[in-house]
């Protein structure tokens, strides 16, 4: 009889692993705590709108570029009715607001981007030229041969520099501000340049229908290959016998036996709860004690009874009056996304608008939601009001036009996904973390593996999906099977 593999978590890594394992002859059961697949790659419905939480740009969205064939294998680009997923590409990557009231458009055309930077800071012409050339090299490294890993490695090395250090190469204060306002100072430059570099090739677009539709497409393909999904099934612990993983126990006491267990769940929960901290090796101990994390978010979603096609899809406006959250953090900027380009997310003639504010102060939100639910809801309402007040100078008068308001917080992220500290993408992309290697297997425990954003610092959907594919290849190799991605 074929081996039975239990995959914990139906996020993109778990879905990918399940899909590739099934097409290689394994019986696969996915156990997921939520009622839907996708994990953090998700959307939800409110008042006729679909609120998208995850994808802003997706590498591999164009045929012939890296990751495209993997997404095709996974069924990500085929909708439930058999139609292809449309891809939205944009003339600009984003627009960044500056503290002096100016703004700069980061054009998707790298030549136009270069000219904009030269116009802003002619005194930095030499360094702007170097930046422009590095973007072109990075674009080429990821947009051609999907097996050019060596080229990618050496190209990326120059983009691992912390953004604070890189900004010092420029003398113009506004140009420095562009880099420093985009990323935390210790994050690697690659967090900005990778997505930006792919825009000329149209190889990092937005899949129409949003993040949950994208995840549902992958789950549907996996199910067609024979994968069994058990939703609303939180895992209490991984069962171990004689140093081997033999199954999982669910929170309701049910046992699911397995010949192999793959955890694509939150890494901290897997190591310290499901495995009771027994197999934490030095690499993971260091990671969870020292590595910085991606933040959590406060997201305000608005349904606006107006077509906002004339506004840019992505921007980070600057405000003199900061927004102060209940966690004590103060913010003069936020990420603004206008989804007028995706009519599947809003009723006809209307537009979904989302605002994201990053915060690492997750504990304050957990405490408020636990201690005083009424005050927690009042804080969400207050923040929505603050956001609307700041959006009106940008989008025009909104009175009487807002027919949906939804606010999610770090508490929401933890509640629905279980992600450690509410982080939306695991370990942050710094020079140290991106250079680190975290093992997929644990010493002293066989027939078990970990995958996903907590095993690959820097995160990202393509990385998660590739991680699932790679673990299937590893298991096939262990069992003497010839791996196939077809099916």
Describe the role of every protein-language-model region.
Residues 55, 453-475:
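A conserved FAD-binding loop/helix module that cradles the flavin
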Residues 99-192:
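Rossmann-like flavin
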Residues 173-186, 396-457:
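A glycine-rich dinucleotide-binding beta-alpha-beta segment and adjacent secondary-structure elements
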